Amino acid sequence: MKEEFKISLAQIRCDAANKTENLRRIEKTVIKAKKEFADMVIFPELSLTGYVVRDQIYELAETVPGPSTTILESIAKRTKLHIIFGMPELSGKTQATIYNTAVLVGPKGFIGKYRKMYLPTHSVFEEKRYFRPGYEAAVFDTELGKIGLIICYDIFFPEVSRLTRLKGAQLIVCISASPAVRRTFFETLTTARALENTAFLAFV
């Protein structure tokens, strides 16, 4: 792992169902992070589309790689930064199957993706209605080190972070769209997951 690098945690506002505007905001934020000497920029869960889009998800979902990831790859290549963002992924194999996916791109293009394993179905959350759960941890070799990806509710379940660490992750990145009222839970959980796995952890 690189001895030292700078991460920009980009807690941007995402417009529901407006990919064009969200991509514009992502690009603007990446350019700003570049000026501030960041090496990696991390955006929230489903930052491409916004979190609450309900049935529009079927029109908004894309394959990965696909049109939007190609745009983000171009931005990453131009700025020479690593970018992590969330989006609804349309399966290239099974019709109408959609995943809640984290995507990692870098200076050389597309690096990899992770599909959220644990889908909440309580309170305002109805992810199981729209998404299929993923089933494997994801860790990727980068110029910065071995980066593992998890998404929001996954962090409540120790086995997800543990599997990610056992696959070699030196930095675990958790992207989230959780409301601020749950901040205390996530502050406790992020500390616990980092300590029990002796790994760095970044949370957006």
Model-derived features with residue positions:
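Extreme N-terminal starter segment of soluble prokaryotic enzymes
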Residues: 2-9
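Short beta-strand-to-loop element that shapes/binds the nucleotide-sugar donor at the catalytic cleft/hinge
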Residues: 85-91
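N-terminal phosphate-binding loop and adjacent alpha-helix
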Residues: 11-31
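Active-site beta-strand/loop signature of hydrolases that rely on acidic residues for catalysis
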Residues: 7, 22, 33-60, 76, ...
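Residue-level recognition of beta-strand->loop/alpha-helix junctions
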Residues: 11-13, 44, 115
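CN hydrolase (nitrilase-like) catalytic-core segments centered on the catalytic cysteine
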Residues: 64-84, 155-204
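Short, basic and Ser/Thr-rich N-terminal targeting/leader segments
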Residues: 3, 77-84, 96-99, 151
